[in-house]
């Protein structure tokens, strides 16, 4: 049953004593009922909380409460409040949806950068960096220091090839010099090196080798653990002086040993390695790439390079190539583990350093060469 709403009279209305049109009242009440039904059908009525302000206003107005049509007015007011709340919720949901969409548009860029950083980290061998949100992300650019030195060859001029080793601390180490047989003989090669020593050292930034800056590799052990490599320290060429004068050599050569001709001194320790260090047997052929390839019978330098399988075999060879008097005047001193020094007493009572032997177990070629450069002065002062 529809309720009737009282209508106030208008001033100056001629028909003020007559009641209002019932059709308009019925239309208003019908409209309010339709609104209530629509809200209930949409489900918004369940989520709406009663408006305290509306209740306060309804309770505070006494005439409306006592009026028989106050329930209809209250229902209209509540329906209006429900529409406002529903409209506000829809606006907030639209705003939240727009914010989520904007975040989703930004996330692919962040994720793309993060994936790119992870791929770079994986390719560089490092661990996968953390998220790109700024929490301790590792820089994907990684500089990997190589543990093993690199060897490279430079052709200084036609027929001259120099092998260098790049040092970790900077600079290069001169390892080997090769001369073409078609363009150089031994004397020409020695003269070329004496004339171009300073230029090569400066041009290729050759540094002095040290144990701290460059780890010396130890060669694999031979089958015989007592095998030793020996060379004569008195034959080691000295570093050329500034005026490049050639130093005379006076070396006593035991009879029966092979000899090489050397009128010029070779001026670098790498050349010492080529001339005075060989891991082969006694009858092995010298390397073709070495400067000490040419053999002559007129010699002032003893370059006998020998490697015996044991200490007894080494002594037997010394007996076969030396006189008995020489053996009686020679003895071996162990300076440190793996280093054996052979000393000979000359007829005048003066001592001579005949050879230094290094154990293969403790010394490689470069290690032995470096040890001799560092301890040469001490050995001469201590034993001679």
Curated annotation (Swiss-Prot):
Keywords: Nucleus, Repeat
UniProt name for this protein: Protein Brevis radix-like 4
Protein species of origin: Arabidopsis thaliana (Mouse-ear cress)
Compositional bias ranges of the Polar residues kind: 260-270
Region ranges (Disordered): 1-35, 50-78, 214-270, 304-325
GO cellular component, one term: nucleus
Protein origin, superkingdom: Eukaryota
Lineage of the organism: Eukaryota, Viridiplantae, Streptophyta, Embryophyta, Tracheophyta
Family the entry assigns: Belongs to the BRX family.
Tissue expr: Expressed in roots.
Basic and acidic residues biased stretches: 221-235, 309-318
Signal sequence coordinates: none
Pfam families in alphabetical order: BRX (PF08381), BRX_N (PF13713)
Name of the coding gene: BRXL4
């Amino acid at each position: 049953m529809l309720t009737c709403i009282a209508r106030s009279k208008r001033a100056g209305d001629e028909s003020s004593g007559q009641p209002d049109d019932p059709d308009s009242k019925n239309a208003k009440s019908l409209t309010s009922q339709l609104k209530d039904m629509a809200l209930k059908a949409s489900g918004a009525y369940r989520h709406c909380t009663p408006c305290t302000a509306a209740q306060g206003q309804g309770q505070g107005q006494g005439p409306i409460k006592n009026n028989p049509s106050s329930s209809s007015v209250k229902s209209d007011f509540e329906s209006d409040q429900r529409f406002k709340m529903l409209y506000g919720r829809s606006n907030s949901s639209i705003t939240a949806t727009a914010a989520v969409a904007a975040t989703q548009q930004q996330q692919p860029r962040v994720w793309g950068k993060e994936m790119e950083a992870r791929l770079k980290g994986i390719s560089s061998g490092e661990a996968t960096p953390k998220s790109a949100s700024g929490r301790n992300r590792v820089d994907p650019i990684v500089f990997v220091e190589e543990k093993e030195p690199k060897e490279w060859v430079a052709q200084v001029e036609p027929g001259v090839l120099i092998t260098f080793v790049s040092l970790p601390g900077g600079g290069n180490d001169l390892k080997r010099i090769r001369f073409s047989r078609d363009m150089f003989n031994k004397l020409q090669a020695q003269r070329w090196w004496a004339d171009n020593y300073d230029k090569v050292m400066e041009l290729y930034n050759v540094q002095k080798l040290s144990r701290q800056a460059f780890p010396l590799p130890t060669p694999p052990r031979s089958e015989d653990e007592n095998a030793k490599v020996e060379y004569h320290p008195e034959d080691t060429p000295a570093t050329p002086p500034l005026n490049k004068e050639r130093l005379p050599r006076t070396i006593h050569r035991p009879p029966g040993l092979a000899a090489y001709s050397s009128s010029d001194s070779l001026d670098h320790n790498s050349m010492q390695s080529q001339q005075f260090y060989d891991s082969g047997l006694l009858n092995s052929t010298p390397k073709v790439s070495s400067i000490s390839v040419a053999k002559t019978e007129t010699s002032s330098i003893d370059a006998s390079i020998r490697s015996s399988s044991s200490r007894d075999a080494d002594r037997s060879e010394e007996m076969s190539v030396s006189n008995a008097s020489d053996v009686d005047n020679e003895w071996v001193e162990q300076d440190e583990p793996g280093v054996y020094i052979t000393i000979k007493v000359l007829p005048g009572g003066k001592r001579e350093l005949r050879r230094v032997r290094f154990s293969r177990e403790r010394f490689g070629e470069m290690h032995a060469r470096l040890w001799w450069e560092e301890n040469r002065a001490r050995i001469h002062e201590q034993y001679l």
